[in-house]
Amino acid sequence: MTEPLRIVFAGTPEFAAEHLKALLDSPHQIVAVYTQPDRPAGRGQKLMPSPVKQLALQHDVPVMQPPTLRDPAAQAELAALQPDLMVVVAYGLILPQVVLDIPRLGCINSHASLLPRWRGAAPIQRAVQAGDAESGVTVMRMEAGLDTGPMLLKAVTPITAQDTGGTLHDRLAELGPPAVLQAIAGLADGTLVGEVQDDSLANYAHKLNKDEARLDWTRPADELERLVRAFNPWPICHSTLNEETLKVLAADLAEGQGAPGTILGASKDGLIVACGQNALRLTRLQLPGGKPLNFTDLFNSRREKFAIGTVLGQ
């Protein structure tokens, strides 16, 4: 085995924390962790540290939280660490070329898609939304472009018909860390050569926003079913029922035709709603002030709210 490396890790959410755990358990020395500044969260809007920061502090690793890495002082601070390698996972800040050039072996990134497909901010959800048959993690050498660098390793997993954004996220968070460790070993001993991405196959995974989560019942049912899965656990698809917000956490395809948004049927199996093509059976819902419930429970207690002919989304 090659000598342990001096590694700087940069990441922010739970997906990144899983990678940091693996690195902390490896022979390599994590000399510092970079993560986003603490953000307000929860009802009290209290400043909360990122999952990566919390993990780093538990292991007594120095934590850096510069608002930008374009600042010469922040760049000098990073250079003073004399890293062999920088590992970046869902960090959320742009790394300018001067930063990419600091580590002796450069910077690598674990990206939650099979590049060049789904470059960008929300690759997991976009893969589910599009109905892709598979997803995975790509470990790449970073360059100035967004997720454009040479690919070092890929780990692949099927996307099932039951996968949500959440379940696929968790599976990729397990696939990524061993792939990163394998890539580090290959870079350290000089055996790993990157594969240039074919830009003609690239597409962009735009950041999620809550407006997209509003169900447009004029769309085909299969498209909406994938959207419901992709946007669980965030931002959660929703519609309105009698001017109240109705969150839709799970749904499957059903037979039926009618004006889009019209309730065609309600039973313990679910609430059947007409779409632009075919129908959707809503199986897990959340009403204002309530908790998420299977439709069976809502049907038993709130049956009157779901009268046939009622139109959602008005």
UniProtKB/Swiss-Prot annotation:
InterPro entries: Fmt, Formyl_trans_C, Formyl_trans_C_sf, Formyl_transf_N, Formyl_transf_N_sf, Formyl_transferase-like_C_sf, GART_AS, Met-tRNA-FMT_C. SUPFAM superfamilies: FMT C-terminal domain-like, Formyltransferase. It is an enzyme of class 2 (transferase). GO terms for molecular function: methionyl-tRNA formyltransferase activity. Its EC number is 2.1.2.9. One of its GO terms (cellular component) is cytosol. Keywords: Protein biosynthesis, Transferase. It catalyses: L-methionyl-tRNA(fMet) + (6R)-10-formyltetrahydrofolate = N-formyl-L-methionyl-tRNA(fMet) + (6S)-5,6,7,8-tetrahydrofolate + H(+). Attaches a formyl group to the free amino group of methionyl-tRNA(fMet). The formyl group appears to play a dual role in the initiator identity of N-formylmethionyl-tRNA by promoting its recognition by IF2 and preventing the misappropriation of this tRNA by the elongation apparatus. This is Methionyl-tRNA formyltransferase. It comes from Pseudomonas syringae pv. syringae (strain B728a).
